[in-house]
């Protein structure tokens, strides 16, 4: 049983993590936002990325997610002001935003702050939820 199931119970979306990243070919990855550690852990353990750095400024969350692979480098810092010390093949902004939570200025700030830290042909992904449902 994988740790996502243990941590989150019967989370069908979480257990699909391997499938979501099956074609992932990047080696040096920066993740903005730790969450429950599922994405960094999948990238390091399942995809064998040589570098997985994670930026998060929530010490309580960092302390809670202490089960992830020791070679994942968690950096306590604000994602909007952090300056990387290396270049990455892939930067994933995983800050759990809906379209009402983020401004064009915030997006521009992220792009301007991180674009110079992408390797040639590197990519930066900023997924944003555009639709939500309420009952």
Where are these regions (language model features)?
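Class I S-adenosylmethionine
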Residues: 1-28, 37, 41
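Short amphipathic alpha-helical segments and helix-helix/interface helices
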Residues: 18-22, 40, 62, 80, ...
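Conserved acidic residues
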Residues: 27, 50, 89
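Class I SAM-dependent methyltransferase core
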Residues: 31-33
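Aromatic pocket-lining residues of Rossmann-like dinucleotide-binding sites
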Residues: 43-46
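Conserved SAM-binding motif I beta-strand of class I
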Residues: 51-56
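S-adenosyl-L-methionine
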Residues: 58-85, 90, 95-99
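C-terminal substrate-binding/active-site "lid" region of AdoMet-derived donor-dependent transferases
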Residues: 97-135
């Amino acid at each position: 049983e994988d740790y996502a199931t243990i941590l989150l119970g019967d989370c069908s979306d979480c257990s699909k993590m391997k499938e979501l990243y099956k074609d992932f070919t990047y080696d040096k990855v920066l993740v903005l936002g730790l969450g429950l550690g599922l994405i960094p852990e999948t990238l390091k353990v399942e995809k064998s990325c040589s570098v997985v750095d994670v930026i998060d400024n929530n010490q309580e969350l960092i302390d809670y997610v202490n089960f992830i692979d020791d070679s994942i480098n968690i950096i306590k810092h604000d994602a909007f002001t952090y300056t990387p010390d290396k270049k990455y093949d892939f930067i994933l902004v995983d800050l759990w935003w809906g379209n009402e939570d983020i401004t064009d200025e915030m997006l521009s700030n992220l792009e301007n702050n991180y674009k110079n830290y992408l390797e040639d042909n590197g990519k930066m992904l900023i997924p944003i939820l555009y639709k939500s449902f309420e009952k």
